[in-house]
């Protein structure tokens, strides 16, 4: 019998919002966790049976039941993509939708089509812009007409329709109402080199906003975002008429494509080589981007790639740029160390935990170390089982009629896995030896699955991802990060019509109107970490780690567990920059890339900082205990579900541009 686990209310809310699919068209009935897990297991069975070309035997079925038990107990997790889409029909025909991570160099129109296709499926996409293969319009097109959709149903034409009239010089692109049509439409827009005097973009076939997409399960945007993005792309193509697009032009087009599915579903990272043309413009392109009329630039995390070890002065210069732009960007990646770990390296995914080639994917899994205290054999068995599941998730057919064939070829060669750890700071007993044993168990699991299937072994297996969402769902600390404090009030935004608001109000939760005047609500959810060490400062037990403390944990994991990269956000104060630079110069060969974020003072209240509330507010044990004692028990799975996208738990990474779950 599978072990049961009773998650916290916060975990239930986030699981419902992020991974439990709607069971009806109205979006009022949702899966339970057991339903979601059953769907994942069916997806695993389907992948395994397809590869074997026969039904599973008793031993193989028993392994799936073992995996089911680990998932139900929230001890291991599969990719967020698989939790959301695994077992659905769309996952069997658009198999790229199962991948968290992708990267490609953008040099041709076909590459741009691939990027939009992946973004539309919810994949996190890393891009390296390359000039020389995409040009602007033949001549500026000054007469641009946008025809918006007024449809009230979702039965629009599924394909694009393009016409060119050489007599009237009118070029028309009518966009169809499918993801395939949208992806191909950007190809038509970028590839058309007509001597046009008028361009009409017709979106009238697109279904209305607010319609649930049956296959993907999320809410459609209508033509609102795509019409804005395409007009902006036309402006870029006009500006470069008769010229090759610069890398920054390609970067901006990719960012505009990222806005089409909304910030809720799209994640990008853009990479420029340090010292190459346009790197300096790229390095500061997000500074005050909104006030400069470049809202799309908020869509991507931006990083510079060093292929030579930087000097102290160069690192100081990068940190000066970061501090001038808010403390986080541009990030920087050690391309030489990445190539040592992954000779195929061309770039990374948005959170930078996977070292990817050009047109390469990776799928992720995780294990919660905190649920295996005093059970090392169970921990090793669990990571072995989830690594085998991870390999099966790489056994996909990517020949979907949109992606270039090399995506499929590269995946067949690399079979990249991403077996990650979470709850790391809850297991300080795991030193170098124990971490190497875990790494070996994961590698053995993935290798054994490959050998049984007669397929290439994965070129890399272990990683460490930020683990933001899955860790909240599993009631554990996030990846290699240490929480802000032992006792936290997590203030969470709920939309105004969410039926959970009244339920939580009746249960005694603190609820206040959102200060933005939208009618939404902010609800206080309590979180505690009893098994993590904190320092007591002014009566609060808070995280006082230095930047070097965090970098040393990164190095420990990189040296002993991680084959790819450990994605962490290092919080720092400006006064620590010199020490960080010294650490980087000393350990540059151990470093691939981290995110940096200016440290928030955990002792400051919202009032101290001039805010109406803080997403996470440290509190004393007495305040925490009194609040928890005042709450009535709830079980979300027994309640009517809220609508999809009803809860905002905040961003999952330092740049705020990676909400891929």
How would you describe each model-predicted region?
Residues 1-661:
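Extended catalytic cores of very large enzyme megasubunits
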């Amino acid at each position: 019998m599978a072990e049961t686990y009773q998650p916290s209310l916060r975990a239930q809310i986030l699981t419902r919002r992020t991974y439990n699919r709607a069971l009806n068209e109205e979006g009022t009935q949702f899966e339970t966790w057991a339903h979601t897990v059953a769907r994942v297991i069916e997806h695993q069975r389907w992948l395994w049976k397809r590869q074997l070309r026969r039904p599973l035997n008793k031993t193989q079925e028993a392994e799936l039941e073992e995996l089911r038990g680990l998932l139900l107990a929230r001890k291991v997790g599969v990719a967020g993509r698989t939790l959301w889409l695994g077992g659905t029909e769309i996952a069997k025909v658009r198999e790229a939708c199962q991948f968290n991570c992708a990267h490609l160099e953008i040099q041709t129109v076909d590459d741009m089509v691939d990027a939009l296709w992946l973004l539309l499926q919810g994949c996190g996409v890393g891009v390296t812009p390359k000039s020389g293969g995409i040009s602007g319009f033949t001549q500026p097109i000054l007469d641009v007409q946008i025809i918006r959709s007024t449809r009230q149903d979702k039965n629009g034409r599924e394909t694009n329709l393009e016409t060119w009239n050489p007599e009237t010089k009118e070029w028309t692109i009518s966009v169809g109402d499918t993801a395939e049509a949208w992806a191909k439409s950007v190809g038509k827009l970028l590839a058309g080199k007509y001597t046009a005097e008028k361009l009409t973009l017709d979106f009238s076939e697109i279904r209305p906003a607010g319609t649930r997409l049956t296959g993907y399960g999320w809410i459609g945007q209508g033509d609102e975002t795509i019409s804005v993005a395409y007009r902006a792309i036309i402006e870029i193509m006009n500006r470069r008429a008769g010229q090759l697009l610069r890398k920054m032009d390609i970067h901006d087009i990719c960012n505009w494509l990222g806005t089409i599915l909304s910030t809720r579903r799209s994640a990008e990272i853009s990479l420029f080589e340090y010292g190459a043309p346009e790197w300096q413009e790229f390095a500061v392109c997000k500074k005050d981007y909104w006030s400069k009329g470049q809202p799309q630039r908020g869509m991507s995390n931006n990083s510079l790639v060093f292929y030579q070890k930087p000097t102290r002065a160069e690192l100081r210069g990068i940190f000066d740029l970061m501090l001038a732009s808010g403390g986080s960007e541009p990030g920087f990646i050690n391309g030489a160390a990445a190539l040592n770990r992954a000779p195929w390296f061309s770039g990374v995914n948005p959170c930078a935990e996977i070292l990817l080639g050009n047109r390469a994917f990776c799928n992720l899994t995780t294990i919660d170390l905190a649920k295996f205290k005093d059970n090392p054999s169970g921990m090793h068995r669990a990571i072995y089982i989830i690594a085998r599941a991870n390999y099966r998730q790489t056994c996909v057919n990517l020949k979907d009629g949109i992606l270039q064939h090399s995506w499929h070829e590269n995946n067949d060669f690399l079979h990249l896995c991403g077996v990650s750890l979470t709850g790391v700071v809850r297991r300080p007993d795991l030193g170098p030896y124990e971490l190497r044993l875990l790494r070996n168990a994961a590698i053995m699991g993935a290798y054994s699955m490959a050998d049984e299937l007669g397929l290439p072994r994965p070129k890399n297996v272990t990683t460490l991802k930020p683990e933001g969402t899955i860790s909240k769902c599993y009631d554990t600390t996030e990846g290699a990060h240490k929480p802000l404090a032992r006792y936290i009030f997590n203030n969470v935004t709920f939309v105004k019509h969410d039926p959970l608001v009244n339920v939580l109000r009746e249960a005694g939760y603190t609820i206040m109107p959102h200060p933005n005047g939208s009618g939404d609500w902010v609800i206080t959810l309590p979180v505690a970490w009893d098994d993590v060490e904190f320092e007591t400062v002014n009566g609060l037990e808070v995280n006082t780690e230095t930047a070097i403390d965090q970098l040393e944990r990164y190095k420990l994991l990189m040296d002993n567990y991680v084959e790819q990269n450990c994605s962490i956000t290092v919080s720092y104060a400006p006064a620590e920059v010199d020490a960080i630079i010294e650490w980087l110069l000393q350990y540059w060969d151990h470093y691939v890339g981290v995110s940096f974020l200016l440290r928030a003072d955990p002792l400051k209240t919202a009032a101290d900082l001039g805010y109406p509330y803080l997403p996470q507010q440290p509190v004393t044990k007495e305040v925490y205990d009194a609040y928890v004692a005042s709450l009535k028990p709830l079980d979300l799975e027994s309640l009517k579900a809220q609508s999809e996208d009803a809860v905002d738990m905040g961003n999952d990474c330092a740049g705020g541009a990676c909400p891929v779950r």
